[in-house]
């Protein structure tokens, strides 16, 4: 793993720890204020920062997350979820399908026989990435705390990714030319998983939302042999508006 990737992973772990500590502190502080929330709005809107982390392909992206929800009842809502983020990933031969690994092995053998392969050479292809996610569905809420709302949800949606390889030497340029003749790789597929989070209520209409999702997808299945798990963390303001939903 490169130094920059290690820094990103360390940053991810620090963010997760900070979010867990913040959640614990707020829950402890809200313990004396147990009780059902008196005001629950019909609609909510979230817009904030997000990051995606897929260790399988060393992907890390920063971006924007948007949600809009309608609450038919106090305990559940139906909503729309969209995120867009950009960053980088890294491809290595072990991630490729057996057919592509065999083709790559043949190419490296030819280069070695011609004396064009440096001693100890390893194939590493960095790439810039842009990812969009789109989903819609239900979310369940627990409102036992007057200042805190807990929620969970299933995740089922579509993910679209554009990967643009950044070859660093003539050999990786040859490999990229075979994998992506157009200079970039685009794909979309379905993902599934689960998510949840916490709304910290500052007033009837304004809250801080902290949330996370863990999903599985298999993007670029024509060249990558395995799917991958992706974590998405988001934080930002949430706005509640509309009429109060009666109990």
Language model: regions and residue ranges:
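Membrane-embedded beta-strands of outer-membrane beta-barrel proteins
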Residues: 45, 66, 134-138, 152, ...
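Cleavable N-terminal export/targeting peptides
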Residues: 1-39, 242-247
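Transmembrane beta-barrel strands of outer-membrane/channel proteins
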Residues: 45-51, 80-84, 152-158, 198, ...
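Gram-negative (and chloroplast) outer-membrane scaffold detector with strong preference
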Residues: 70-174, 189, 234-240
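Extracellular loop and loop/strand-boundary signature of outer-membrane beta-barrel proteins
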Residues: 51-55, 120-126, 176-184, 219-225
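Short glycine/proline- and aromatic-enriched beta-strand/turn motifs that initiate or cap beta-hairpins
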Residues: 33-72, 84, 232-247
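Repeated loop/turn-to-beta-strand initiation elements of outer-membrane beta-barrel proteins
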Residues: 43, 75-80, 146-148, 200, ...
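Short sequence motifs at beta-strands and strand-loop junctions characteristic
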Residues: 39, 58-61, 126-133, 184-191, ...
């Amino acid at each position: 793993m490169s130094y920059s990737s290690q820094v990103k992973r360390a940053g991810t772990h620090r963010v997760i720890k900070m979010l867990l500590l913040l959640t614990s502190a707020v829950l402890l502080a809200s313990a004396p204020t147990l009780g059902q929330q008196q005001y629950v709005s019909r609609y909510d809107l979230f817009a904030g920062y997000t990051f995606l982390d897929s260790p399988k392909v060393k992907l890390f992206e920063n971006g924007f997350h948007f949600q809009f929800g309608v609450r038919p009842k106090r305990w559940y809502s139906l909503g729309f979820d969209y995120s867009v983020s950009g960053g980088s990933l890294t491809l290595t031969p072990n991630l490729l399908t057996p057919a592509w690994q065999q083709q790559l092995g043949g190419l490296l053998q030819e280069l070695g026989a011609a004396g064009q392969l440096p001693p100890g050479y390893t194939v590493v292809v960095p790439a810039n990435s842009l990812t969009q996610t789109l989903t819609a569905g239900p979310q369940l809420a627990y409102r036992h705390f007057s200042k805190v709302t807990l929620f969970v949800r299933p995740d089922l949606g579509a993910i679209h990714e554009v990967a643009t390889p950044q070859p660093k030497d003539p050999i990786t340029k040859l490999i990229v030319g075979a994998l992506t003749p157009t200079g970039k790789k685009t794909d979309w597929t379905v993902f599934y998983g689960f998510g949840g989070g916490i709304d910290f209520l500052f007033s009837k209409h304004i809250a801080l939302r902290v949330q996370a999702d863990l999903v599985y997808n298999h993007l670029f299945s024509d060249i990558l042999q395995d799917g991958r798990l992706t974590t998405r963390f988001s934080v930002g303001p949430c706005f509640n508006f509309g009429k109060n939903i009666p109990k």
